[in-house]
Amino acid sequence: FGSVAPGGYAWVFPKESVSNIGLGVQRKMSKGRSLESYANEFIERYEGEESFRGAGYLPMSGTIGQFVKGNYVLVGDSAGMVLPSNGAGITIAMIGGRIAGQVISEHINNGVDLQEYQSRWEAQMGEVMRNSKRSFTIGSLLFRFPDWFLNIAFNPFTRGFIWRAVTCRKMFWVF
């Protein structure tokens, strides 16, 4: 984990005759190296023709404090709707877009306050985002350990705990 993608993760998803290969890193754990340098090093381990190469950054700190200002609403990456624990954002943005669209329609037709968008978002996604942020924080601490330690720590006995963290559920029954 740490040597390939510090504070993040790497993936190889086979798709018929091609593969999606990539990684995510935490900038503060990257030791001054660029995302591109980590990506190049990882991708070059695999054979085959390259059809696309790109790199970008995600807002991994969770949602911003205010989605609505006046008649403007923010959705998706602009509102920080990316799960800090795993970088997932498409589904989260779609949920935000659906809620925003409903509230905007109600605002136009019935005068509903646009702030209702943030209230509904919190009601539907607030716990998921909080759990994801907690998982990210714990993961950030764990990923400071060397790879050999992580290989021991991530084992069949901890699988359930890790799965709960990655899927943004409460990792412990206490909090």
Where are these regions (language model features)?
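C-terminal helical "tail/cap" subdomain of flavin- and related membrane-associated enzymes
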Residues: 102-175
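FAD/FMN-dependent oxidoreductases across multiple families
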Residues: 6, 27-104, 109
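Conserved FAD-binding catalytic core of PHBH/FMO-like flavoproteins
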Residues: 1-35
